[in-house]
From Swiss-Prot:
InterPro entries: Rbsml_uS13_C, Ribosomal_uS13, Ribosomal_uS13-like_H2TH, Ribosomal_uS13_bac-type, Ribosomal_uS13_CS. This is Small ribosomal subunit protein uS13. Located at the top of the head of the 30S subunit, it contacts several helices of the 16S rRNA. In the 70S ribosome it contacts the 23S rRNA (bridge B1a) and protein L5 of the 50S subunit (bridge B1b), connecting the 2 subunits; these bridges are implicated in subunit movement. Contacts the tRNAs in the A and P-sites. Part of the 30S ribosomal subunit. Forms a loose heterodimer with protein S19. Forms two bridges to the 50S subunit in the 70S ribosome. It comes from Corynebacterium jeikeium (strain K411). The gene is rpsM.
Amino acid sequence: MARLAGVDLPREKRMEVALTYIFGIGPARSKELLEKTGISPDLRSKDLTDEQLSALRDVIENTWKVEGDLRREIQADIRRKIEIGSYQGLRHRRGLPVRGQRTKTNARTRKGPKKTIAGKKK
């Protein structure tokens, strides 16, 4: 099983898809990575040679932040917004949508399950 950036890549998937299992690498970045290393997108991850794996590893480590580093950076950005008291930080602190979505209805994912108000009768 091929292992890149601390993630086990699925053996039977095409490399173009398998690379997207790494946090921080989506479809576009996956294609770009395969072009840089000269690996066919149709190749299965089980068929990768050690040289190809090391080439992928080098490009990923030297070009982008992925997995743990990226997650830590995102969390640090959120903490910074909360500390400086920005509007976005306030929304994060209150557990509400940050990017201007409506909250009168919807936003249940962010707000959690409904809190029933006692004594409200029809």
